[in-house]
Design a protein with these regions (language model features):
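Mg2+/Mn2+-dependent nuclease catalytic core
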Residues: 112-168
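Metal-dependent nuclease catalytic cores that hydrolyze phosphodiester bonds in DNA/RNA
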Residues: 1-125
Length: 168
């Protein structure tokens, strides 16, 4: 897919410190949207799940989900940049399948940018996965990976994240 440079997106350097992920925006250290949301969300569900499955299993599941999510993002980013990406290793199969399912089920007409830094009045910043024209409408997309469907109340942070990106 061809990249259309519709907006002059800036790039902000991202780094982590003891308080979480931050971006350097015009010499100001600005917290990331995900750091803010992580600090304000109710962690009881995650804590209960960790107690139920045990720390070792919870860590294994989280590492596996992170690996699959990162790989899926790579496939989507490179594909939408027109470069193509293929991890022939066994761990690449599931992310490829997930990315293909996404791309087969979304109508992306123009790609305006991948991995775009966004910031709002030096208050917060983040990186959205895709800015594009989808179904004839300007869209901000942040890809999410899950091994099974999530309940509506479990994705509230995702909606808040996209709302913050929309403001930026």
């Amino acid at each position: 897919m061809k990249l259309v440079r519709k907006y002059p997106y800036k790039h902000y350097n991202r780094f982590s410190d003891t308080t979480g992920r931050k971006y350097l925006v015009d010499s100001v250290k600005v917290p990331s949207v995900t750091t803010i949301l992580g600090a304000t969300k109710d962690k009881r569900f995650l804590d209960n799940w960790r107690r139920k499955v045990g720390n070792e299993e919870a860590d294994r599941i989280m590492r596996q989900a992170s690996t699959i999510g990162t790989e899926m993002h790579q496939v989507l980013e490179y594909t939408l940049n027109g470069q193509g990406y293929y991890n022939a290793m066994e761990e690449g199969a599931k992310p490829r399948m997930m990315a293909k399912t996404i791309l087969d089920n979304i109508k992306i007409e123009e790609v305006w940018g991948n991995e775009i830094s966004l910031e709002y009045q030096n208050k917060f910043a983040g990186t959205c996965d895709l800015s594009a024209l989808c179904y004839g409408k300007p869209s901000i997309i942040d890809w999410k990976q899950a091994n099974k469907p999530k309940k509506e109340e479990w994705v509230e942070d995702y909606k808040l994240q996209l709302g913050a990106y929309y403001l930026a």
